[in-house]
Regions:
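Basic, amphipathic DNA-recognition helix from helix-turn-helix-like DNA-binding domains
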Residues: 18, 22-26, 34-99
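Positively charged, aromatic-enriched patches within helix-turn-helix-type DNA-binding elements
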Residues: 111-181, 185-188
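Active-site beta3 strand of CheY-like receiver
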Residues: 2-7, 12
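His-Asp phosphorelay/catalytic-motif detector in bacterial-type signaling
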Residues: 2-4, 28-36, 154-155
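Active-site phosphate/pyrophosphate-handling residues
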Residues: 16-19, 48-51, 75, 127, ...
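Conserved functional loop/turn residues at catalytic and ligand-binding sites
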Residues: 2, 54-56, 64, 69, ...
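Short boundary/linker motifs that mark transitions into or out of structured domains
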Residues: 96-111, 188
């Protein structure tokens, strides 16, 4: 069975939510590796949140939670996912492609090609990369990235954006490239040069 979204608790019987997230992102049992993953957990420590995002979560909601807020977050993730998933039938295909720094990003089919190799990104990772690439040379602070990608105000400082940028860099093999795609402007934010 194919799912569009997973809501996981960290403390589940038999297998914890972190392991389920790891297996989904790893393609276990034919799972939809790109589907949004939302953690819903009583664990409120920053370590648990960062670990969840590092493993591939797109959102993390702590208990107790407001059911209306959770519903809004799920709808937001599904909306982003259906916009980026070419098989959803939710939008018409229009040539919406950016080519920059040896990388091609196609918004219509959610494909990213770096140095001739396709890389798989979660919807959040894709949105961050697309935001930076569609504004070459512009520096975005972590708060600006969070507000534009998650469509929410930042109420407290967190490492969410930095964790996603780190995962993006890992998938694009930034550590082996001489010309980095995503540049850190220390104390300011991130950008992709023209």
């Amino acid at each position: 069975q194919v799912f569009d979204l997973a809501i996981l608790d960290i403390m589940m019987p038999g297998i914890d939510g972190f392991e389920v997230c790891r297996q989904i992102r790893g393609g276990a049992a034919g799972s939809n590796t790109d589907m949004p993953i939302v953690f819903l957990s009583a664990k409120t420590e920053e370590f648990d949140k960062v670990l969840g995002f590092t493993l591939g979560a797109d959102d993390y909601v702590t208990k107790p939670f407001n059911p209306l807020e959770l519903t809004a977050r799920v709808k937001s993730q599904l909306r982003r996912y259906t916009q980026l998933n070419p098989n959803s039938g939710a939008r018409e295909t229009v040539n919406n492609e950016i080519t920059i720094k040896g990388m091609s990003i196609n918004r219509d089919n959610h494909k990213v090609i770096v140095d001739g190799e396709e890389i798989k990104l979660t919807p959040i990772e894709f949105d961050i990369l697309y935001l930076l690439a569609s504004n070459p040379g512009k520096v975005f602070s972590t708060d600006e990235i969070f507000e534009k990608v998650w469509n929410e105000k930042v109420y407290e400082a967190n490492n969410t954006v930095m964790v996603h940028i780190r995962r993006l860099r890992g998938k694009m093999k930034e550590d082996t490239r001489q010309n980095k795609i995503i540049t850190t402007v220390w104390g300011v934010g991130y950008k992709i040069e023209k």
